[in-house]
Curated annotation (Swiss-Prot):
Subcellular location, principal: cytoplasm
Species this chain originates from: Streptococcus pyogenes serotype M3 (strain ATCC BAA-595 / MGAS315)
Annotated cofactor note: Binds 2 magnesium or manganese ions per subunit.
GO cellular component: cytosol
Pathway(s) annotated for this protein in UniProt: Cell wall biogenesis; peptidoglycan biosynthesis
Compartments where found: Cytoplasm
EC number of the protein: 6.3.2.4
Protein residues bound to Mg(2+) 2: E301, N303
Record: residues binding ATP: 162-217
UniProt protein name: D-alanine--D-alanine ligase
């Protein structure tokens, strides 16, 4: 039986490229090599596509994907050279130019099936401000927030924010993930600095009310019919779950399933599925919630390309539901082909 080609795209132009490499390495080890041939392409910070490795069997534990330190620019290709008839692309890319609709649009132009959500839902979910406004419109609870757009009157924004929110306040670039560029402010001076930091990553800044809450996450899988997981909890031993804590210091543990009341589980899974459909989601997403001590649920964000490292919540949530990592990848490939066929049928 001939193997299907799975094209892994990793690296990318955003500040989350290191997470992308970790995720892609976990995927390449989890693939069922009885069914798939894996071809990998590294995208540099400048947007160059580099042809790297090919795997017909599971790589050794010591083998690593090629990155900036090991690639050769002689392997640079035209982006369109990744095209291969019958192949499915797994764009294991995080952040801007990865999960914001850009690469998804490129792959649709190439007429290649790809894992993950489509152009529209990727771009909406990537922007935290737009996501909040969409979810508010369908009655899904959000924590209080204000918005600052680069070029607006910063002093007026500070006045509005301090009138509506109380410290602590979290400041986030609208279009970044993995906690990149996020700050916690306890004073007006810190708030101003936090906005300036966020502006180095994006021109749109979300300013959000800090809440004392547990962080609960739900996995989503499907196209027209979406399935959700039991929730898992991120248990922190740091005050703020930032990039350093997530990926460098590993100062987190996870409780899967989360220890929450059944009524809360039902509410979160319902909100997650409704939000996924409202944003036009397909393939997969991870839905992140805040759960306060008095039982209030807030939907924080939808992550359309969650981390796929061996310690990432998304694959572990599905493993808890009885879907092992290799089978999850296979299901994602099937969903990618299904949505591709549907999209193509609408163009004829």
């Amino acid at each position: 039986m001939s193997k299907q080609t799975l094209v892994l795209l990793y690296g990318g132009r955003s500040a989350e490229r290191e997470v992308s490499v970790l995720s892609a390495e976990s995927v390449m080890r989890a693939v069922n090599y009885d069914k798939f041939l894996v071809k990998t392409y590294f995208i540099t910070q400048m947007g160059q596509f580099i042809k790297t490795q090919q795997f017909s069997e599971k790589p050794s534990e010591s083998e690593r994907l090629m990155t900036n330190e090991t690639i050769e620019l002689t392997q640079k290709i035209k982006p369109s050279d990744i095209y291969e008839e019958g192949a499915v692309v797994f764009p294991v890319l995080h952040g801007p130019m990865g999960e914001d609709g850009s690469i998804q649009g490129f792959l649709e132009v190439l007429r290649m099936p790809y894992i993950g959500t489509n152009v529209m839902s990727s771009s909406i979910a990537m922007d935290k401000i737009t996501t909040k406004r969409v979810l508010e419109s369908i009655g899904i609870p959000q924590v209080a927030y204000t918005v600052y757009i680069d070029g607006q009157d910063l002093e007026a924004c500070l006045v509005e924010t301090l009138a509506r929110l109380t410290f602590p306040i979290f400041v986030k670039p609208a279009n970044m993930g993995s906690s990149v560029g996020i700050s916690k402010a306890q004073t007006k001076v810190e708030l101003r600095k936090a906005i300036q930091l966020a502006l180095t990553y994006d021109s749109r800044v979300l300013i959000e009310q800090g809440v004392v809450a547990r962080e609960i996450e739900v996995g989503l899988l499907g196209n027209d019919k979406v399935k959700s997981t039991l929730p898992g909890e991120v248990i922190k031993d740091v005050d703020f779950y930032d990039y350093q804590a997530k990926y460098v210091d590993n100062k987190i543990t996870m409780a899967i399933p989360a220890d929450v009341d059944q009524s809360i589980v039902t509410e979160m899974r319902s909100y997650a599925e409704v939000a996924f459909k409202a944003l036009g989601g397909c393939g997969l997403s991870r839905c992140d919630f805040f759960l306060t001590q008095d039982g209030q649920v807030y939907l924080n964000e939808l992550n359309t390309m969650p981390g796929f490292t061996q310690w990432s919540m998304y694959p572990l949530l599905w493993e808890n539901m009885g879907l092992a990592y290799p089978d999850l990848i296979e299901e994602l490939v099937t969903l990618a082909q299904e949505i591709f066929d549907q999209r193509e049928s609408h163009l004829i």
